Amino acid sequence: NPRQIHIQHALGYPPLEYAHLPMVLGPDKKRLSKRNAVTSLQDYFDQGYLESSMINMLARLGWSKGDKEIFYLDDLISDFRIQEVQKAGAIFDPSKLDWINNHHLAALSFDDFKNRLIPFLDSLGLDYMQKQNSSEIIAAMRSSKPNLLGVAQDLIPYFSELSSYDDKAANKFLIGSEVVLEYVQRKLNGLEDWNEDSIDKALMEAQTGLSLPTPKLNQPIRIAMTGSTQSPSLGLTLSLFNLEEVNKRINAALKYLFDTN
């Protein structure tokens, strides 16, 4: 800064105080660069990280306040002191950003969360308006991923036709599950009330009737409904679809198994 200081003196400006922030490092403790990490704020926003999360993350690089990790703008305005920033390199850990963003997303009201999510649903071509229970589906899935794009991608099976199954999941749990699918389908079709509690009861009865451990019963059904082994509790997952759609997807899974054999 010597040149700037001389110019300030020559112009008669009062001397400024300078502060240096620590160098930002990647998880490998090498200087963060485009070659080993996403370095554009816009790229993070495009993935559905909140502005408040990025401010939180960046403010914590080289600065801390006890063991507190989650800060909102008002917190930082009152707590942040540039004098407390350390000189040593600060690590930008994407997994920590995920954790911080999870907290900031959870703090949003449902309406705020949904409004922020909608552009990501639109970008994936998901017609969420066709579902009368779209808000219920979004509420069930809102914590499935640490960013809005990930949540939107997880919602694809709920707002569009299921076109494929995860290969690894299908090979591990779906192949050979014809008896499970047919047995559970009969149980579900015998329900008088279609809600999470009644579905859970039917699943428990099916598990007892087939003498199977939970994964052997639940995962084939979960894959048939969503294409993967990742979803909320199975009773809740099934309740997000109507019985007609459940039958359609179980029948499609049975056809897939028949064609595979």
Residue map of PLM features:
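Alpha-helical recognition segments enriched in aromatics with Gly/Pro capping
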Residues: 1-104, 223-225, 229, 252-253
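A general alpha-helix detector
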Residues: 40, 53, 57, 96-100, ...
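Amphipathic alpha-helical interaction elements
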Residues: 46, 102-106, 122, 126, ...
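Short alpha-helical scaffolding segments that buttress acidic/His motifs in well-ordered protein cores
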Residues: 57-58, 100-101, 138-145, 152, ...
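Small-residue-rich helix-loop
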Residues: 110-210
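Charged substrate- and nucleic-acid-binding regions of tRNA-handling and nucleotidyl-transfer enzymes
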Residues: 197-259
